Every structure is written in structure tokens, then in C-alpha cells.
A protein has these predicted regions:
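Helix-start/capping segments and mature chain N-termini
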Residues: 1-113, 130-343
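Short secondary-structure junctions
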Residues: 115-123
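Extended, Lys/Arg-enriched charged tracts that mediate electrostatic binding to polyanionic substrates
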Residues: 122-132
Length: 343
């Protein structure tokens, strides 16, 4: 599939993120300062094979969406929060962090350029800023990248669950997903570290994801946060440096509290999780940008399959997902100032 061009007739069954718009936003960091950003045709970049990011992993990224409302207006969801997390990741990796205002300008100018490519609901325009070190030096393992590039890509995406909501099968692994001090950094190395266990679990157990539980404490999956739900109660791990602070997670918990849910954030053990899901009304779910909230039907641990509740996507999971999607699409009031309009 041609991933460098897109039009409104692009196939809706295309894999998530595989179709890109014709334009991208780009800015370079050189001589100690960020240069002016600009819009360019999406395509190859002049990156040296000795670039710092290719050898020493100095790269981080974000992922969020712009939505077309029923009235035709376009809004970016939680732009400020995602830029804040990008800055946090850049600092953790000793990358030169651009001014947040410049990042916002790049995102909004790109969405404005690509207005025609923003699908109507239930689709959206997925936005991917990526920041990486470009200085060509294969001997710079102990040195921060003195040159860098920031690119913002845009990808029209459609309904993640076009075939209907299906419960996930999750394999439990008693190990950490990544180095504890890097868990909250959105960097490619963390996803690569989770890929081997995830592929093995898929091959051996038909699992969709791996839930990492180092020392018997529930952490996260390879690409999503983990929540337990029962009635109007939600239990999830409290934030620390060992796992990614999901913006979708934050949005869901904020909405849930506003709607009267009892939300608890603390250390959650695997034993507690297994007891929770054994209840008839027990639910478990994964939260993330792509799917918003996905129900878990089975946890696989120690050679056993543990059914979550009745094994289907639970009613509270569906209700919370629908509530957040309604806010994202502008169908419900923006109580928390999460929407940034595209002029």
C-alpha cells in the first residue's frame, strides 16, 4: 500500500496508521536552536546512517487524534496534555525539547492543511509527532544528541471496531515491560522490548496482548493501560515511573469521577486482579488512543484461562467508552477544556 499519499476514497479496511496524508510538518534543531517549522510533502528525510537515534535510541513520540464534528468543525483532543508528555519524554532522553507553542502550531497547521482528509465519525485523523536525534556520530553513546528533528505525521483512521466489540485474550507475564526509570517515557525502545513477549504469547496462547506484572504487581500491557471495573467502581495502578501515564486513561478516570464512579488508584496485585475478575460483574479493560477502551474477556496465567466476568465486554466498559467517544466527537459538552479547535 502506498503510505505517502491519501485521498478521501482510501480503503476503510486499511490497517491502523498505514495511510498517511500528503503533507507533514517538520522542524530541525541545529546550532543550539530550533529552526522555523514548515509543511512539506510527506516523504523520505535526509537522515545520516550514523544518526544518534538509529544507534542509541534517542527518539520519542506521541499519538492523538483530531475529530470532525457533525457541524463540520474539527477539534484536536487533549493537545496540551500530549505535548506536555512529549516534553517529559524529551527531557528523559536528553533530547532538545522544542517550545510547546511550536509543537502546537505544527500540529494545528498540519490539520488545517489536511482538513479534507479528516474522516467523519466514527473515523478520525491520527496525529503522530516524533522527535529524534540526528547528529551523525557513532561514538556518541555517552553524549546527548546535539542535533534533532521533529516531524508530525497525520493518518486518517476509521472505526477500530468496525466488526463489533470483541473481548481480548491477555497473557500474564511476571516481568517488567521495560527499565523502571523509562516506563513513563513514550519511546520506541519500550515498544520493541514488549514485542518479543507479545508475539510469543500470540503464537503459543492466541493472546492479543501481554499484561506485565513484575513481582506479582499489575503494571501495564505492551501498548495500553489496564483497568479493573465492577459496577461503579474502578481500580487501576497508581502512577509511577515504571509505566506510561496514558492520556486516555486520565480522560476516562476524570470522566468516571465526574459521573459518580468510585475510582481507586493504588498498587494492584495479580491475586487481587484474579479475584476481581472472578466476580460475575467483574470487568477488565485496556485503555489507549487507538481503541479508547477495550474489554478483556480472558486472562491467561500459570497454564490456566481465567474468564473475566461472563467473558464478554462488560456493560460499564461499554458505557465508559461511549461516554469518552461522545466527548471526543463533540456530541457531549467539553466539561474539562480538552478540545482545541482548528481554525
Amino acid at each position: 500500500m502506498n503510505t505517502t499519499a491519501m485521498n478521501t476514497t482510501a480503503p476503510r479496511q486499511a490497517p491502523f496508521g498505514s495511510v498517511l496524508t500528503d503533507s507533514m510538518a517538520i522542524a530541525w534543531y541545529r546550532d543550539g536552536k530550533w529552526l522555523a517549522d514548515r509543511l512539506e510533502q510527506t516523504g523520505a528525510l535526509p537522515i545520516h546512517p550514523a544518526a544518534h537515534a538509529l544507534h542509541y535510541g534517542s527518539s520519542c513520540f506521541e499519538g492523538f487524534k483530531a475529530y470532525r464534528r457533525a457541524d463540520g468543525g474539527i477539534h484536536v483532543f487533549r493537545l496540551d496534555k500530549h505535548i506536555e508528555r512529549l516534553m517529559q519524554s524529551a527531557r528523559a532522553l536528553a533530547l532538545p525539547a522544542p517550545d510547546p507553542a511550536q509543537v502546537a502550531r505544527m500540529v494545528l497547521s498540519l490539520v488545517e492543511r489536511c482538513r479534507r482528509d479528516v474522516p467523519e465519525a466514527p473515523g478520525a485523523l491520527y496525529l503522530r509527532p516524533v522527535l529524534f536525534g540526528t547528529v551523525p556520530n557513532i561514538g556518541a553513546a555517552g553524549t546527548a544528541a546535539s542535533e534533532a528533528c521533529l516531524v508530525v505525521l497525520a493518518s486518517p483512521v476509521w472505526d477500530y471496531f468496525a466488526g463489533g466489540l470483541k473481548p481480548l485474550r491477555i497473557f500474564v507475564q511476571l516481568a517488567a515491560r521495560t527499565a523502571p526509570n523509562l516506563g513513563m517515557v513514550k519511546t520506541g525502545g519500550n515498544y520493541a522490548a514488549a514485542l518479543g513477549p507479545t508475539l510469543a504469547a500470540r503464537r503459543e496462547y492466541r493472546a492479543d496482548q501481554v499484561l506485565f506484572c513484575p513481582g506479582g504487581e499489575v503494571q501495564e500491557t505492551g501498548a495500553a493501560n489496564f483497568l479493573l471495573i465492577r459496577g461503579k467502581k474502578i481500580l487501576t495502578r497508581s502512577l509511577d515511573a515504571t509505566f506510561l501515564h496514558g492520556v486516555t486513561r486520565d480522560s476516562l478516570l476524570t470522566l468516571a469521577r465526574a459521573r459518580g464512579y468510585d475510582v481507586s488508584e493504588r498498587i494492584v496485585t495479580l491475586d487481587e486482579t484474579l479475584a476481581w475478575i472472578a466476580q460475575p460483574d467483574g470487568e477488565a479493560a485496556l485503555s489507549g488512543t487507538a481503541a479508547v477502551l477495550t474489554g478483556v474477556g480472558t486472562l491467561i496465567h500459570a497454564g490456566r484461562e481465567h474468564r473475566v466476568g461472563n467473558g464478554e465486554v462488560g456493560p460499564e466498559t461499554q458505557a465508559l467508552r461511549a461516554a469518552l467517544i461522545a466527548v471526543q466527537r463533540g456530541e457531549s459538552p467539553d466539561e474539562f477544556g480538552w478540545q482545541t479547535p482548528v481554525r
